[in-house]
């Protein structure tokens, strides 16, 4: 999957870090001088080199993010149980749209703000009704920070190799690319959305190619082999 994305992107981008944050995993792909420059090809090697992180914006259990979270003025130890997922976090922050919110909730319950608040509360051993909804929306932002930390650290590792032009962007890919934009701001790097290198006909108002980039990239790569469309211009 990641190789299809990389092969399509390197036609248009000379130097960039592609960051594909999906429902379950995050792929970090280095493009240098218009070529794919990765160190690992197996999952084991890619995890060793921070090219594959098992963290995503829908299915990741919250217990995988941290052992403690701020709550009611204290650092609270969380439940080591699969009571809630990152989908609950981004549902509460308003960053998870219905079109990509396709996995069942951890408890099989409703995928609503109140349902997500209930699941976050359970991670802390309390009841959602003990606090107003805006409290749980604030609490969700704490969880969001815990997920950003390892992603940002991995990006810092890749950028520390040196030789990156000042205009080399972080390219946001996948349903969690809103986190890539956040990382770009914090790391003071340019940001570019992967949609910019796809032909307009690939996306529709109800469908974004960036949400399933590997599939869209395969379509474009196949089209370019068969018809010559589009080899060097996404427009």
Where is each model-derived feature located?
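Helical "lid/coupling" subdomains associated with nucleotide-phosphate turnover
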Residues: 1-18, 27-235
């Amino acid at each position: 999957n990641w190789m299809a994305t990389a092969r399509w992107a390197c036609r248009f981008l000379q130097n960039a870090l592609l960051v594909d944050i999906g429902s379950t995993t995050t792929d970090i792909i280095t493009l240098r001088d218009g070529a794919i420059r990765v160190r690992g090809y197996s999952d084991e090697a890619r995890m060793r080199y921070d090219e594959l992180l098992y963290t995503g914006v829908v299915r990741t259990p919250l217990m995988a993010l941290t052992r403690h979270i701020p709550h009611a003025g204290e650092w609270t130890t969380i439940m080591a149980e699969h009571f809630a997922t990152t989908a609950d976090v981004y549902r509460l922050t308003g960053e998870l749209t219905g079109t990509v919110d396709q996995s069942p909730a951890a408890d099989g319950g409703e995928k609503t703000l109140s349902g997500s608040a209930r699941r976050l509360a359970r991670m802390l051993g309390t009841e959602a009704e003990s606090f107003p909804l805006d409290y749980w929306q604030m609490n969700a932002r704490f969880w969001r920070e815990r997920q950003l930390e390892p992603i940002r650290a991995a990006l810092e590792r890749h950028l520390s190799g040196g030789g990156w032009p000042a205009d080399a962007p972080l390219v946001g890919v996948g349903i969690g690319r809103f986190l890539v934009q956040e990382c770009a701001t914090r790391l003071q790097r340019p940001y570019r959305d992967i949609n910019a290198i796809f032909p307009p006909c690939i996306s529709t108002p109800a469908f974004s190619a960036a949400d399933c980039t590997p599939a869209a990239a395969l379509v474009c790569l196949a089209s370019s082999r068969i018809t010559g469309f589009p080899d060097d211009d996404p427009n």
